[in-house]
Amino acid sequence: MTEIMASLISTVHLPVQGARQAYESWVNWTQYMNELFAQKVEEAREGKHGEGMDIMGSLVRSSYGEKEALRKSSPGRAEKGEVGKPKLSDSDILGNAFVMIVAGHETTANSIHFSLMELAMSPRAQRAVQKEVQAIFGDEPPENWEYDANINNLLGGMLGAVLNEQLRLMPPVIAIPKHVTKSQDQVIILDGKKVTLPAGAHIALDTIAVHRNPRYWPTQPSKITGREHDLDDFKPERWLVKITSDGTQQIDSAPESEDEEDFGGFTGHDTSAQLFRPVRGSYIPFSDGARSCLGRRLAQVKIMGVLAVIFQKYSIELAVDEWANDDEVMMMTNDEKKAVYKKAQEKARKTLRGATTILTLKLHGQPGFVPVRVVRKGEERFANIVD
């Protein structure tokens, strides 16, 4: 964290707008975090515990809560120095808060954003999601939904397939950094051959490339691009049928996809057993192994929960204002609506595929957004007729 901040400070005087914006963001972030930190320290010292999942409060209490409680209950021990030192330094608390917010919130928000955009571009998939949500929840209000009763149906159905496909196409992190221990070389097996990685070597796992490698994924000729495979296309249906690239059915998961190790977090697979399960290492939106994302199940539940709430009552359509106004759309035939929506789809796909990475993958450049309309179910102009 210190190295990152030092880099920002060293570039603030560069005549580059991005550098100045990064520095300004750091200054604002530091101010907000210091204010929140001071507030949580005061609450911890007073023995206050707020409701909900308070990240900063939990970190602060791990260092200040127990110490202050002991000081109040046993002042003599505190004077003798028997009160332990904080488990985390102030810098550790602020650094961990930064990591948790970026890794645990921005990545999830990006995935929700991309999922909504992909479903707006793929109305047929959106209708399938709505049908599934209706079958599972009906008109039951979200506050009455039960995790244990519904999570497996969501993970193993169309909504889970949409999430998996979105993460395959637009993973939060496109290059996962790894390195070989400095003490010795590391030998790995690649296509049956031993490959030696030198000690201290830095390696980046190319998430985008492995997620689109026809060697590991069921694929067909693309109906969108005309290419011989459709791995650049958003196609959640590929997860619903367990088939290999030669068209034969895959009944069981590949042995190398098994993950029985307990690394302290959710220890299941990244995908549901009811869906297509790629060979281990070919699907890594949450990384893999001992340093894989500990919050992956929480992220999956948050994303699917948001999507289910939205599509229980609403539809999302691409805005076509660039090509036709509302009055013109009302006068269109279905074929004319499909034609104008196709233009919006083509532009939206181009925009999304232009996403870039600054910490995480998102729409940083121009235009930086995909215009959409959120309408109640039954009031759609395009989503009910376009595939």
Language model: regions and residue ranges:
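Cytochrome P450 catalytic-domain helical core, especially the substrate-recognition surface
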Residues: 1-39, 138, 371-373
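C-terminal, well-structured subdomains that either form a transmembrane helix-short loop-helix hairpin
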Residues: 92-113, 190-193, 198, 202, ...
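Conserved cytochrome P450 K-helix/beta-meander segment immediately N-terminal to the heme-binding cysteine loop
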Residues: 205-273
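Cytochrome P450 I-helix active-site segment
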Residues: 50-53, 121-173, 198-199, 229-230, ...
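Cytochrome P450 heme-binding "Cys pocket" and the immediately downstream C-terminal segment
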Residues: 123-127, 253, 278-282, 288, ...
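Cytochrome P450
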Residues: 12-32, 51, 87, 148-161, ...
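Conserved cytochrome P450 catalytic core segment spanning the I/J/K helices
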Residues: 26-111, 261-270
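C-terminal helix/juxtamembrane-tail motif
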Residues: 365-387
